[in-house]
Amino acid sequence: MSNKLVKEKRVDQADLAWLTDPEVYEVNTIPPHSDHESFQSQEELEEGKSSLVQSLDGDWLIDYAENGQGPVNFYAEDFDDSNFKSVKVPGNLELQGFGQPQYVNVQYPWDGSEEIFPPQIPSKNPLASYVRYFDLDEAFWDKEVSLKFDGAATAIYVWLNGHFVGYGEDSFTPSEFMVTKFLKKENNRLAVALYKYSSASWLEDQDFWRMSGLFRSVTLQAKPRLHLEDLKLTASLTDNYQKGKLEVEANIAYRLPNASFKLEVRDSEGDLVAEKLGPIRSEQLEFTLADLPVAAWSAEKPNLYQVRLYLYQAGSLLEVSRQEVGFRNFELKDGIMYLNGQRIVFKGANRHEFDSKLGRAITEEDMIWDIKTMKRSNINAVRCSHYPNQSLFYRLCDKYGLYVIDEANLESHGTWEKVGGHEDPSFNVPGDDQHWLGASLSRVKNMMARDKNHASILIWSLGNESYAGTVFAQMADYVRKADPTRVQHYEGVTHNRKFDDATQIESRMYAPAKVIEEYLTNKPAKPFISVEYAHAMGNSVGDLAAYTALEKYPHYQGGFIWDWIDQGLEKDGHLLYGGDFDDRPTDYEFCGNGLVFADRTESPKLANVKALYANLKLEVKDGQLFLKNDNLFTNSSSYYFLTSLLVDGKLTYQSRPLTFGLEPGESGTFALPWPEVADEKGEVVYRVTAHLKEDLPWADEGFTVAEAEEVAQKLPEFKPEGRPDLVDSDYNLGLKGNNFQILFSKVKGWPVSLKYAGREYLKRLPEFTFWRALTDNDRGAGYGYDLARWENAGKYARLKDISCEVKEDSVLVKTAFTLPVALKGDLTVTYEVDGRGKIAVTADFPGAEEAGLLPAFGLNLALPKELTDYRYYGLGPNESYPDRLEGNYLGIYQGAVKKNFSPYLRPQETGNRSKVRWYQLFDEKGGLEFTANGADLNLSALPYSAAQIEAADHAFELTNNYTWVRALSAQMGVGGDDSWGQKVHPEFCLDAQKARQLRLVIQPLLLK
């Protein structure tokens, strides 16, 4: 049975054969339509509560059959469902005890369990039999009524009061059915058979948790005898973007005489901008309002207008509908995309709908947090990867100002990409198979019909990672003809250039910046966007600056970082990843790619993004401000600027608010007011910050949007103060002074005791470290294999020599070691100790004989775990690495040591602070201070060692026995072009053959 035949007549009986028929994807559904809101009165409209909508959300009854063998005839009115359990709608079944969540990326969930090919489905196909009892609201009694499922995964059969209603697929757009003739005023029984798998599952192979259920709202929609079925509003700009034009196309259910309408356009204050009145003589209402006095919509200035359409019969209001619109022009000219005449750069992120507790049943609170945090992080665009989101999300993007790529629910990644990235499209769908055209095209149509009125949506995307073929070419043709006001996108053609015309954008995933530059400098025909880039898995997003530097090329129009939020599911207070639910096959921690953690707290990566995505580019040089205004529509005078002077990390001066007026796209140099600073005062930081001048929906007045600083560097140098007493015994060297004692083992070659005021600070022998707990990117790049020789090299260093030398104001203890790795000379550590207990440590690495990379070089110290607090002067407040310094600034920062551990889904290298001048660890009794000695110092203080972190699969497995200090001369970058092969960029790597030196001073921290 083809879907064409299904649509020609009403089908009264369900058929399980539909589950495996790609040509049957909707049965008895009504045509998709706009997501406008309708009300029965003016009062309802103003309150925002409609009596024409009845929610069926809440507690439903359910029988869950893992094997797909559910109760027979459960949909019958007289069926006994007293043994059914309770389930929440909206909600994912697997998070409510029905089945288990499963995380896979490319592979299908059944891979290795059954050998099946499209459109076959697994023999084990879980079935959820849902039941909901309800009484019909009185406002519905005299109206036509539809039943709408906003999101259901994956295939649903629907019955009402024993009557078959219809069938739906496409998990992420509504399935809506007319149910008027089946309804009763009271005691209605709605039954839904939801199957986890159908032929549609081959088109829904997105990189996410595979979960099922009624995960979006279920509602009844009442339709008065005069009813707005569909509304298309094309809001554009004319007269050099100074005036507005509104083209109105309304489809009205017209069943009454003497019908009329009134259309109003109102601004954000509710004031009338324009109106149109007239009779209704047919189901189609079309007209244009021109020369409207409107302000343009953009992400910078999201000016919205409310269109209200009133429907009357003989002068009585039967229905009023509303839709927010933004007037804007989005155009593709000469291979470049323009918004309202300005070349646009997308500073974007990909975003899954995800909540760590609720799965895909996310809340309005989740959405608002995401959007506000994006705006505060200078993110101006979001790609709905890889399916249409809830309608509310687009309304919020319209309101707060985000540019959107809306993407059809279509991904068949596992049908063509095989192990190791090998491509084999032999059973790729939809490909060239016309049996899949209807289902594929319906997904695009459903999305466009629902979302067409949202100003925030600039680009329609056909889907994700599904290769290419004639079906996509047909889809692209439909999109461009149906909506010439937007640009059409599809990245999959990069794998089959025969279908290059199926996208208007040159879109690539994870292309290195140098590869992109080659395209941009060779007569590009299309605009370029990195639709996925800077893979943010774990400790990542290194060298994002290489990509933002491409903005100088007109055809480079930005990109979308993968991705926004870690997909970690919470259970028993812990965040878990693939495999933790005994789900197999699985792709484990690959679901942890977020700029924010799964609990919606910000990761350190986000500060880097905020700095590099800023529309105000600031540079302080020679005391002057170099300012570039990359906004498209906002003068820099809309912000105020502050200059601040810091000496040794302490604020000594701050200016009054300053204003610098640059039009969008302009650059300028401005003299700044600075007080005189004597050279001997210390290290001086000249800082400029840019702030919001007024409250905005996403941040308050004074919020910092950008900053920059110039440092007149002055690193501390060790100067000994008096000589300690020396006790040179057979097995140990002892050094004593005023209230301190240090003991060096002549056998081990390390200090074995460090006491200040009688307190022991060394809990274990120090060790050399050349390693770090592997990051997700390290694992993906193969560094665990390539650099394995360094993992335990420091642990097994062998003492070659130890000696001491008495100097006038200090005592030198010199040690030399060999490693199980061939070096160009001895590995040495020199300790210069003065009479006050200060220890200047100098560790020299001579370089390895064999070429290769060195992860890090420095020392590990195990200190008392009671040292729970830190305070330091260096780059902060976040962890930083040589390829991810942006967004951190010199200052004095403090907090709890445990907070230095970033909770990546799988534990890995974390907590490093760069350009440290001094670092204090303490409790109420005192502590230690580590100070740079004439050279940059990297330092981390954590409750766990690198070895513990490396061995752990989850943070909750770690135990805190000591406070671990890693003092490093250098550490390689974290990388981030991708997480499955790309190496850290060479300029951020450490050459193992190069000599390195660590210099720092350790001294007691005395608290008053």
Swiss-Prot record:
GO terms for biological process: lactose catabolic process. SMART domains: Bgal_small_N. It catalyses: Hydrolysis of terminal non-reducing beta-D-galactose residues in beta-D-galactosides. Monomer. Belongs to the glycosyl hydrolase 2 family. The active site is at 465 (proton donor), 532 (nucleophile). The keyword Transcription regulation does not apply. It comes from the Bacteria. It holds the Pfam family Glyco_hydro_2. GO terms for molecular function: beta-galactosidase activity; carbohydrate binding. GO terms for cellular component: beta-galactosidase complex. Residues 29-48 are annotated as: Disordered. Keywords: Glycosidase, Hydrolase. InterPro entries: B-gal_small/dom_5, Bact_Beta-galactosidase, Beta-gal/glucu_dom_sf, Gal_mutarotase_sf_dom, Galactose-bd-like_sf, GH-type_carb-bd, Glyco_hydro_2, Glyco_hydro_2_AS. This is Beta-galactosidase. Signal peptide: none annotated. Its EC number is 3.2.1.23.
